[in-house]
Amino acid sequence: MGQKVHPNGIRLGIVKPWNTTWFANSQEFADNLDGDFKVRQFLIKELKKASLSRVVIERPAKSIRVTIHTARPGIVIGKKGEDVEKLRAHISKIAGVPAQINISEVRKPELDAQLVGDSIASQLERRVMFRRAMKRAVQNAMRLGAKGIKVQVGGRLGGAEIARSEWYREGRVPLHTLRADIDYATSSAHTQYGVIGVKVWIFKGEVLGGMPIEEPKADKPKKQRKSRK
């Protein structure tokens, strides 16, 4: 059976940036990695209602800098910045070094795979029909300029006895093209029948990296030979 490689992992360093950027020696590496995991888990739990897209972690000179990408920055910041200050203090306690928090707003949540997946999962938990939730997400993404989108759900759909998976696609989703900017994310819906998994692929266009593109040269018209009389 053909298996698919992770669309984000294969594009790291080509069109996708890393979510964690730091260097450490062998003694500190495990502690930093464990700290990053705990910080991410804490933020996912705390900012469940803030439409959290992704968390980028940097570690410059014995400190930690966390960039939170969210569609609702107001919820993260809180009244007069109280909530973000609590987050900063807790992250500093987890990491054991001074922490700095930056907040980046996601302008188009309909084109962010993680936010689309979380939205579908939330609808499934509220007993919305899975086909309706999938089609609505696909239509919104295409309306806002996506080149293609694919949504897949799997589990006991509609409370069925036998689990199955269904998918819906519109436009192009070229997984084999490395320069294709494909946003991929997963989410899960906890329903009374069990867990339903959600996968989302969004194709936003091709990244050509500033390389000059040579246009095909037009063929020169051939000279017609004069016939001998």
Curated annotation (Swiss-Prot):
Signal peptide location: none
Gene Ontology CC annotations of this record: cytosolic small ribosomal subunit
Coiled coil stretches, renumbered: none
One MF annotation (Gene Ontology) recorded for this entry: structural constituent of ribosome
InterPro entries: KH_dom, KH_dom-like_a/b, KH_dom_type_2, KH_sf_prok-type, Ribosomal_S3_C_sf, Ribosomal_uS3_bac-typ, Ribosomal_uS3_C, Ribosomal_uS3_CS
Record domain KH type-2: where: 39-107
Record key words, sorted: Ribonucleoprotein, Ribosomal protein, RNA-binding, rRNA-binding
Biological processes, Gene Ontology terms: translation
SMART domains documented for this protein: KH (SM00322)
SUPFAM superfamilies given in the database record: Prokaryotic type KH domain (KH-domain type II), Ribosomal protein S3 C-terminal domain
Membrane-spanning segments: none
Disulfide cysteine pairs (residue numbers): none
Function: Binds the lower part of the 30S subunit head. Binds mRNA in the 70S ribosome, positioning it for translation.
Protein family (similarity comment): Belongs to the universal ribosomal protein uS3 family.
HAMAP family to which the protein is assigned, alphabetical: Ribosomal_uS3_B (MF_01309_B)
Subunit structure: Part of the 30S ribosomal subunit. Forms a tight complex with proteins S10 and S14.
UniProt-recorded name of the protein: Small ribosomal subunit protein uS3
Organism: Photobacterium profundum (strain SS9)
Encoding gene per record: rpsC
